UniProtKB/Swiss-Prot annotation:
Gene Ontology terms: biological process: mitochondrial cytochrome c oxidase assembly
Source species taxonomy: Eukaryota, Fungi, Dikarya, Ascomycota, Taphrinomycotina
Top-level lineage group: Eukaryota
Motif (Cx9C motif 2) on chain: 46-56
Subcellular localization(s) per the UniProt record: Mitochondrion inner membrane
Domain characteristics, as noted in the entry: The twin Cx9C motifs are involved in the recognition by the mitochondrial mia40-erv1 disulfide relay system and the subsequent transfer of disulfide bonds by dithiol/disulfide exchange reactions to the newly imported protein.
Name of protein: COX assembly mitochondrial protein 2
Motif (Cx9C motif 1): 24-34
Topology in the lipid bilayer: Peripheral membrane protein
Cystine crosslinks: 24-56, 34-46
Length: 89
């Protein structure tokens, strides 16, 4: 089944976010642990955890290029297409 360009875009962004979250799992868990059970006080009580988490995600986003993921996805898509063409011959 072929995906629409919008579905492909959604999948690529989801894959990129998954990699970012995996890379910063500890920082995210630390922030969640601090924020659990708080409402307004999260702003000042969890400031350092929030900064650490954001810094990690920013650094990971610089290292894990969304365009690299797109390139790998397109390469796999082309290989799949070529494989199907070879089967038809």
């Amino acid at each position: 089944m072929n995906k629409s360009p919008i579905e492909e875009e959604f999948d690529l962004r989801k894959q990129h976010q998954k990699l970012l979250k995996k890379n910063c799992q500890k920082e995210i868990e630390d922030f969640v642990k601090c924020a659990t059970g708080r409402t307004f006080s999260v702003t000042w009580k969890c400031r350092s955890e929030n900064k650490t988490m954001k810094d990690c995600l920013t650094k990971a986003a610089d290292e894990i290029s969304e365009w690299q993921i797109r390139s790998e996805y397109n390469k796999a898509k082309q290989e799949s297409f070529i494989g199907k063409q070879d089967e038809k011959k």
